[in-house]
Amino acid sequence: MTIPAALDLLLELPSQASSSSGSRTFSLPRLVGHLAYHAMMLEVHLTPKPGLVDTANNGAHRDMDLNTFIASAEAIAPYLHSFVSAGWESAGNPAAQLLSALRPIGIEAEQAMFAATQGVNTHKGMIFILGLICGSVGWLKANQLKIDAQHIGETIRQACQFLVIDELKAKRDCEPETAGERIYRQYGLTGARGEAASGLAMVMQHALPAYQACLTKGASTEQALWHTLLVLMANNNDSNLVSRGGLAGLHFVQEQAQQLLAKGGFLYQEIEQALTALDSVLIEKHLSPGGSADLLAATWLIYELVQLFKVRH
């Protein structure tokens, strides 16, 4: 498949009118939000993706398809800009207080998503992860700090350092248990909250280095994303998989991904056919690595942001 040509627009940096000094400026929220929106679109259009919605099929999902995801992404897009603005406006506060500024926007984004999808959860995890990245970039830029993977990860770590303690370990008898809380109680897995509290360790230590290495070796964006998705599937304790198939389902997917990586990943001549075959297996088993899909979009977004601000600095 061909990744949407709309990605070419990312090279056209959105700009405002010239300032009084004649120098051109750009809208940070619009630019970063634009990239985050395309991260969502890139993820869903990447085909094949084992167990996930793509242009070929609905994966292991019966309540959503490609059009559902597109409608959801379009509904969420304005809030991605707002995350950046909220981060910028929080510049006078420490990073540890950033989450409280982003959370109300995240709730509104979820409501917009559910309205666009008739109640289907297409992007809840994506809103959380991309919202943190967008907010962190706004905060870093306003504080005149370097925008690179290390600073983005550390800002998110500080913002979310108490998430696991406050929301998973704390017993809340008066509130209904969320899926993430149930999985933590049953298996001790911290899911998206734990990933955020770690400063996106899975992205920083596994996915981003893999993606960069693939590109260095001459992989196309599509090939690099396939390989990186396999790296995530092999290493990520994906709560989506645990929710659907327990630890056995998680370990099955991890082993399948490890086998394809052992064959060379994107360098394996039959990688596309192998991914298609694994897609069929995961659909039959009703397994969907949705958490890894969210982190794949986050990986691409962080990579593009780092490249962008290298140029702009």
UniProtKB/Swiss-Prot annotation:
Gene Ontology molecular function: any one: ATP binding
Pfam families, alphabetized: CitG (PF01874)
EC number of this enzyme: 2.4.2.52
Keywords: ATP-binding, Nucleotide-binding, Transferase
Reactions performed catalytically: 3'-dephospho-CoA + ATP = 2'-(5''-triphospho-alpha-D-ribosyl)-3'-dephospho-CoA + adenine
InterPro entries xrefs: CitG, TriPribosyl-deP-CoA_syn_CitG
Record-annotated membrane-spanning stretches: none
Any one GO biological process: prosthetic group biosynthetic process
Top-rank lineage group of the source organism: Bacteria
NCBIfam families: citrate_citG
Family matches, as PANTHER family: 2-(5''-TRIPHOSPHORIBOSYL)-3'-DEPHOSPHOCOENZYME-A SYNTHASE, TRIPHOSPHORIBOSYL-DEPHOSPHO-COA SYNTHASE
The family this protein is said to belong to: Belongs to the CitG/MdcB family.
Protein name as annotated: Probable 2-(5''-triphosphoribosyl)-3'-dephosphocoenzyme-A synthase
Species, as recorded: Vibrio cholerae serotype O1 (strain ATCC 39315 / El Tor Inaba N16961)
Gene designation per UniProt: citG
